[in-house]
């Protein structure tokens, strides 16, 4: 059980790594892909042994489990900023949105785990992680499309206003949800689950709608520019 939980504590980082990489996939050179893989792995290996030591010494707690997820997420977010350069606000937005998605997904996993029941804390963490991973796999296509639609279209154009308006929204929502429930909490009541789902869905819908509106505005501007150019070319 110790090895299984240690492995799951490491694998739980994979969803955020994948989702934050998706929007920038076409803009990462083969050299930088290798650098990302190196640093991701360099972070996962010591984390595995740290988790194994924590579990073997009987120090595994809900606080450590959650803090470990968050700390690795922050460190690898910094790695992304340093390697995939020129997209700082885009990375911060991706960090917040993916953290919110994973937090929401695993909150559902926690609630289901509570309903199933478990003996020791380690058993509950294993079950929660497995359920969370299963939900992530089920919804991965939708999560991926969300990241592609809210980030990717605005990387190659002058979208400074867009990122100035949106980059902090998912981070603020994620932190407000995290701090309101606390790192030490494991038990999830139905009311807590509903509040997390509503907070997460509201943030996702808001970011998606802002992206849609901004995309439409850019299309109108481009159309007006083409019409203006066409009009100028037809003048005697």
Can you annotate each of these PLM segments?
Residues 1, 122-127, 190-195:
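Interfacial loop-to-helix junctions that mark the boundaries of transmembrane helices
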Residues 1-14:
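Hydrophobic transmembrane alpha-helical segments in integral membrane proteins
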Residues 15-37, 50-166, 171, 177-185:
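Juxtamembrane segments at transmembrane-helix boundaries
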Residues 40-44, 48-50:
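N-terminal, Lys/Arg-enriched amphipathic/low-complexity engagement segments
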Residues 130-134, 193-203:
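Small-residue-rich transmembrane alpha-helices that serve as helix-helix interface/gating elements
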Residues 141-154, 177-190, 200-232:
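Juxtamembrane or sensor-core-proximal signal-transducing alpha helices
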